[in-house]
């Protein structure tokens, strides 16, 4: 279930594919509704859920300045794409037997952030799975530091580019 590093149109990206045992509509709500996003996404998110709609991302504890973004593509309940600062994220869902398949792509600003961000998304997507299963625990970033560190090291061993600063000095 590890993500992969690739280049998309010459830009660095990390990509994940996960299968969840929940219908597309249920997963769609978890990836588009701010109350549910707050349970697994690394920021609280305000979103005007329409193409061109404004997005605002606030970091827990005010550790970083809020970021702005916009919805770039919206095809409910199949595709949700948006900018996050100068980066681009895309979430695609498709039915798969008794559940659905999620494809998550994050086009990055720099190669060096790939291992760091892949580890973070790995934790977040695990958290999404827990949320879908009914575990309303804390959002990523609170108790996930050791889990993130393990994944970060694993991504580096897999040859995913690294070297970007680690928030909090981790």
Regions picked out by a protein language model, each given a short descriptive name:
Residues 1-44, 167-170:
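Hydrophobic ligand-binding cavity/cleft-lining segments
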Residues 11, 22, 52, 75-77, ...:
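Residue-level signal for tight coil/turn positions that link beta-strands
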Residues 13-17, 54, 66, 79, ...:
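Intrinsic-disorder/low-complexity, polar/charged segments enriched in Ser/Thr/Lys/Arg/Asp/Glu/Gln
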Residues 32-33, 42, 76, 126, ...:
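Residues at helix-coil transition
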Residues 39-83, 165-170:
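Glycine-rich portal/gate segments that line the openings of hydrophobic small-molecule binding cavities
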Residues 72, 79-132:
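Beta-strand/loop substructures that line and gate deep hydrophobic ligand-binding cavities in soluble
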Residues 108-169:
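A conserved amphipathic terminal alpha-helix motif
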């Amino acid at each position: 279930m590890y993500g992969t590093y690739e280049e998309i149109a010459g830009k660095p990206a990390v990509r994940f594919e996960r299968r969840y045992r929940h219908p597309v509509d249920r997963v769609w709500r978890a990836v588009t509704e701010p109350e549910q996003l707050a349970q697994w996404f690394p920021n609280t998110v305000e979103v005007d859920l329409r193409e061109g709609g404004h997005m605002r991302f606030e970091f827990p504890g005010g550790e970083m300045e809020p970021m702005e973004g916009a919805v770039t593509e919206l095809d409910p309940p199949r595709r949700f794409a948006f900018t996050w600062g100068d980066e681009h994220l895309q979430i695609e869902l498709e039915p798969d037997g008794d559940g659905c398949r999620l494809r998550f792509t994050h086009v990055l600003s720099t190669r060096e952030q790939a291992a760091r961000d892949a580890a973070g998304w790995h934790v977040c997507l695990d958290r999404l799975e827990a949320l879908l299963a009914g575990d309303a625990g804390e959002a990523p970033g609170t108790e996930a530091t050791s889990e993130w560190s393990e994944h970060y090291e694993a991504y580096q061993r897999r040859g995913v580019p690294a070297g970007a600063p680690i928030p909090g000095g981790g």
